[in-house]
Structure formats: C-alpha cells, structure tokens
C-alpha cells in the first residue's frame, strides 16, 4: 500500500531526475504536501535559502558527488514527510549516498556543544578523553561525538563508521544458490551471488 504523499514524492523526484526541472504537476504536488503540513508553500524560497555546504545530511550526495539544491530539497522533503516510517535507509541506498564512507570514515556528531552550550553546564564537566568523560572534548570539534568521548576505550566506532560496496546489496544465501543448481554445486547454479559477497559460507 502506497501513501499518497509517497506517490507524490516519487513523482517529484522522478520528474526532476529525468528532466532537470520540475513540471507543473511536480510543483503542484510539492506545494500540496507543504500546505497540508502547515509549511510555507514557497518552494523557490526554500530552495534559494539552502546552502549545501552547511548540510550534514547524507541525502546531499549521490555517489561521491553533491546533488543540486532542488534535488536535495526534494530529498529533504521526502525525509521529513516519511519520518519514522522506515524508508530512510532504503532511500540512501537507492541514491548511493554512502559512497564517501568507502574511502573516509564518517563520525556521528550531535549538538553543537562547544560554541556556547557548554556555558550552561558545570565548569568541571569531564571531557578529557578518559573513561570518566561524559562528553567528547573540544579538541575533537564543536559538535559532540558520542562514540569518541572515551579515547582510552577499544570502541570500534570511536574513529567512525565505514562502508563497503557490498553493503548496497544483501547477500544471497548459499543454500538458495545451491537449491538453484541441479547438482547442488554453486558453480552450476542459476543464481549468482551479489557482487562483492563471497560464495562460501
């Protein structure tokens, strides 16, 4: 079952990807979504106000290239509209938005704490990188890094997440590959393993 909003978002994205511009229907659908949500229907103002260099969203990228501001705003509209419906990961896979993590790790960051927010807390807040630290230190940047607060730990996520090309597709089970072979030999199977995944269990 499709939500009407998702069908409209799909049309908007497909229209823009195909034509490089929004047709009258795509613009109308976008304004309808925003009107129903109680948000300004001036999509051109939203697009003009977007600075991609300030966006930390994975949706800014297709592969390792930044998309343009209109396509990004369509993606952001999708993210907001389908919030908490379990679609975001599939969208990011569809757009190949994790490619930059193949060559460089991504470190999750939270709130901008070290500009001014820290002033609202006790002066003795522990941020020294030890096991007693409650937040990541200022030397790591202004934004809190939840997995980097304890620099003494062997936490594998401390230095960030990485991604592998294989993760864009799920592996096919070896038993399924064998089942599709008359002699149960994976080399004679009608089903092939997805790229970058092994054929041994």
Per-range role (PLM):
Residues 1-201:
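Acidic/polar-rich alpha-helix caps and helix-coil junctions
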């Amino acid at each position: 079952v499709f939500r009407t909003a998702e069908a409209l978002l799909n049309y908007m994205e497909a229209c823009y990807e195909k034509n490089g511009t929004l047709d009258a229907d795509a613009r109308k659908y976008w304004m309808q979504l925003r009107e129903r949500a109680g948000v300004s229907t001036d999509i051109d103002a939203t697009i003009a106000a977007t600075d991609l260099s300030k966006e930390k969203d994975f949706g800014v990228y297709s592969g390792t290239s930044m998309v343009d501001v209109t396509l990004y705003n369509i993606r952001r509209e999708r993210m907001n509209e389908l919030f908490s419906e379990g679609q975001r990961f599939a969208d990011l896979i569809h757009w190949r938005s994790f490619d930059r993590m193949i060559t460089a790790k991504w470190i999750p960051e939270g709130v901008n704490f070290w500009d001014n927010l820290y002033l609202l807390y006790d002066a003795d807040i522990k941020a020294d990188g030890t096991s007693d630290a409650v937040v990541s230190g200022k030397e790591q940047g202004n934004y809190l890094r939840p997995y980097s607060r304890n620099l003494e730990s062997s936490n594998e996520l401390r230095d960030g997440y990485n991604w592998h090309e294989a993760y864009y597709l799920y592996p096919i089970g070896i038993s399924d590959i064998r089942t599709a072979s008359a002699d149960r030999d994976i080399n004679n199977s009608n089903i092939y393993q997805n790229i970058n995944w092994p054929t041994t269990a």
